[in-house]
């Protein structure tokens, strides 16, 4: 079976680069192709399924004239291809990516997505709030399910960083978790007073995190910096930590998956704030089961 996954991997964001690894592990018997917003000249003509996800790809940062955003138009390319070719398609382990301080405008911001969300064969999302909002704007009552993010299924055998005998605080910058935030500085000072080693680690693209890491190094030349760890190294670093401060969604996921205490700010992005921290991370397997059911439907149709 040939499946095209459309996400945001390949740009250096550790969380987005984790999804292909999870899907490759879970669907070893299938031929998997991965695409993102660098659109191909054409899509393969022999696809059996088109999957949008994982990640927070359901968003529309509208322009000043309220026209669909470039991101939406890129995703539209793939959805239109699936519809025109009659290829079954849907969303897997996705999230709504609402703009800061615009939560109440989600109906307007997500309007271009509505006809596509209504037509998708399956939709799995990573928070109960996402389910409610999709049902609100589409009117559909079935085919939309919540499971914890698929990245909870990620495992690696990468060696842990060498232990220096001191507890370790790992800081994953984004948003207010940054070197110049006064509250963050205060928390780091408290950790140092308890003899914690402080490590700053990027989990975003270099264009997003480079300045934060440079500033952390300027403020404290002795601090350890991890610039481009990749999923395996990031997972191992977080697993070796006593505590994690993170502004990145997958910094929280990697910590929670390994039972590492973590802190996120009250002003965290929508996807972090909406995470159901009571849900069992093992329930992320629901995304896999949903896609397996879609694959079985395709195979049954082919047999007929």
Predicted regions and their residues:
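Active-site anion-handling motifs in enzyme catalytic cores
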Residues: 1-304
């Amino acid at each position: 079976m040939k499946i095209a996954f459309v996400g945001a991997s390949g740009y250096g964001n550790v969380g987005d680069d984790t999804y292909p690894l999870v899907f490759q592990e879970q669907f070893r018997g299938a031929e998997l192709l991965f695409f993102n917003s660098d659109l191909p000249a054409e899509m393969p003509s022999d696809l059996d399924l088109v999957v949008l996800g994982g990640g927070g790809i359901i968003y529309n940062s509208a322009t000043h004239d309220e026209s669909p955003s470039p991101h939406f138009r890129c995703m539209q390319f793939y959805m239109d291809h699936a519809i025109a070719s009659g290829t079954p398609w849907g969303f897997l382990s996705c999230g709504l990516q609402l703009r800061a301080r615009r939560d109440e405008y989600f109906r307007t911001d997500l309007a271009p997505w509505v006809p596509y969300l209504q037509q998708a064969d399956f939709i799995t999302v990573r928070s109960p709030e996402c389910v409610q909002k999709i049902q609100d704007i589409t009117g559909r009552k079935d085919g939309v399910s919540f499971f914890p993010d698929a990245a909870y299924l990620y495992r690696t055998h990468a060696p842990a960083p060498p232990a220096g005998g001191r507890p370790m605080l790992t800081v994953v910058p984004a948003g207010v978790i940054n070197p110049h935030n006064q509250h963050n500085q205060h928390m780091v000072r408290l950790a140092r007073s308890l003899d914690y080693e402080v490590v700053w680690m990027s989990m975003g693209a270099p264009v997003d995190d480079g300045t934060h890491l440079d500033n952390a190094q300027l403020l404290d030349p002795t601090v350890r910096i991890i610039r481009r760890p990749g999923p395996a190294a990031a997972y191992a670093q977080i697993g070796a930590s006593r505590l994690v401060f993170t502004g990145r969604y997958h910094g929280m996921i990697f910590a929670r998956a390994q039972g590492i205490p973590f802190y996120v700010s009250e002003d965290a992005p929508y996807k972090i704030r909406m995470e159901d921290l009571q849900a069992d991370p093992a329930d992320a397997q629901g995304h896999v089961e949903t896609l397996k059911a879609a694959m079985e439907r395709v195979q049954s149709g082919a047999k007929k």
